[in-house]
Amino acid sequence: MKIVIAGAGSVGRYMAKQLAASGHTIVVIDNDPSAVSRLQNTDTITSLQGDACEVDVLTAAGAADADVVAAVTGDDEDNLVISLLSKQEFGVPRVVARVNNPNNEWMYNEMWGVDVSVSTPHLLTGLVEEAVTEGSLVRLLSFDHGKSGLAEVTLADGSPAINQTIGSLQLPREATVVAVIRDGHVVVPA
């Protein structure tokens, strides 16, 4: 896959290296020459200095034939503009955008060209909740702009659901159990 990453900070550089190691072709764009210079061009990673909010820079990066654009700068407004241009001007099939300020999370939707938003503050809050709670529900991920999600439920000692079959539990109709962790082993329900 060809992936264009807007933002060569620590997040963008890490993503570029990991995705390139998985066999993807990566183009990284950043306005800051020092950020671009920290990324070495290889057979699978190309770096480009420029403003990813500009159509001509996205054109030079090959956004028109990208499978994914990831807008991961440290600026929410830039990430939204990059997402909108990627989707509207270039028809990129999948646009992922980083949310820096949780107050801006509501804007990261299809109207702005965002297919998947990643909110670091939101994810960290979920991880902290998971670390400090027991016998409760922790939201892990949100899909389709909050219409559905993935949650982890930890059963407290003495819960009536312990040792029951999934079929015998009275779960909401819209809920699906995708995995059970029992004694450290993952069990996928049939």
Where are the language model's segments positioned?
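Cytosolic regulatory regions of ion transport systems
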Residues: M1-A190
